[in-house]
């Protein structure tokens, strides 16, 4: 619930229309046209405060006049109260449309299948990016437009003999447009000023007027309301895949399957940006260098002539310009000379990105090999190995930054390494390659079915996407592996009753991930368990089916358990974890093309986090997305 307007959010307002047209041109040729249209227009999605850090006191002070629920400074929040103070209701609009044309042509021993599809998705997300009622951000609109066209052709062969197979081709063409505009609110300047001197807010409010005067800028230039940044990105993705697979019956009970696929992907990316927020464009290293040099030389300007006249002072200022001051350390000369301006670096979260137009081209051949043995008419044992490939992924968000060069940037006079400017990051994630080994058994009898599989998965250059509170960062773990097993069972207790049970055990780890993103910079996650992957998952369901005259009905209950896991890699498990214990139930019936269902979800009213992240522009504060509470509903469907 949004407490400023007393409005419930996370509502559901969705519509969906789908239709099919079937044409049987002959006994051998069938053509099917499927079209759909859907619309979402909701107040979504609700965010809860997980920890109200030191910046919370500033937001809740009269200077900013904002509120954070529940409002206790430097304390845990109450995320499962599902309440928040916002200065804007979040709105989520999604429009989907598309069609597909399926052709199935029986040519005797051969079969030709063709699937042509076209889809469009338009999105618009607008929300309060600081998730408080303080006017830190007035405008944060994300719009997307994705057009996708695909074509698949498959020619399969089955003459009833020992050999079966297929060959095919798949083409994928996707055009993505993504725009994001962020504008600061009326309170951000005061908020930023107080953060520069929290113990003396009055002095802090003079930080930026003094800095503007020193730079010869009009007062009010920095963090002016309704200034910010806009990005306009485009990505054209063209890909094709050529594949084939062959099944060979070695004897009546043993079948060997082998297949291969060649994938080629090309992506062209165009990134444009405009930035009207002036402070994020200030080079604080250059600023600090000028201030330090002036202080050491009695106010002289940082010019080549003065550097030559005062070489010792110039060298000291050059080294100090890239050294951040540490709280509590003695002032110079008792302590090291440092650049106090770098204390403002975290406030440059709308730092400009140089526009670029780049491309990537990737190709890979993957394969699958599988051996299956029919131990009996009811039992099948199999084992196999397969490989996979995922092409380069580009960061289309406003935090897309170039990779750091082999030779690091230098301080103004070149005497020291400059880790501050230019700002480097990750513009894309390298392609990832996977290998999966699996052995298993499948059994099916009159009233019992059992599937069991052991697997070992290895992903090289695992692609990770982490939200740091001010933007998304793409990266690669050198290697990520997972071992585990999966069990699925089905028991027909009678003609009316059915019991389903499944469980999965996963033991994943980052074999190599030395530069992962953490809450306070990079961290080494090598040897650690990836966030969000549960060790144990258990699902069970009981269904009762019945018929009375022309009415078919059912009653079903299902339960899901997922063991405790860290929610995201860059927040500790003590702050953001997830453990699931949910019970769902439904009762429904169908008659004359009408389906009617009454359902309840999360009847245990279980609480857990879907995701979490560092709060935007609020160092030390964290937010998260809680799950849906206990929910009831009715579904009515008509089949024409």
Model-derived features with residue positions:
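Transmembrane beta-strands of outer-membrane beta-barrel pores
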Residues: 37-41, 107, 118-122, 171-175, ...
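Gram-negative outer-membrane beta-barrel transporters
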Residues: 156, 164-166, 170, 252, ...
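Repeated loop/turn-to-beta-strand initiation elements of outer-membrane beta-barrel proteins
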Residues: 28-31, 109-112, 162-165, 253-256, ...
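Solvent-exposed loop segments that connect transmembrane elements
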Residues: 1-8, 44-85, 128-139, 181-230, ...
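C-terminal beta-signal and adjacent terminal beta-strands/loops
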Residues: 183-189, 494-499, 560-568, 589-640
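Residue-level signature of outer-membrane beta-barrel architecture
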Residues: 21-24, 35, 104-107, 147, ...
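Transmembrane beta-barrel wall of Gram-negative outer-membrane proteins
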Residues: 1-55, 97-99, 147-151, 155-172, ...
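Membrane-embedded beta-barrel scaffold of Gram-negative outer-membrane proteins
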Residues: 102-107, 111-117, 122-127, 374-483, ...
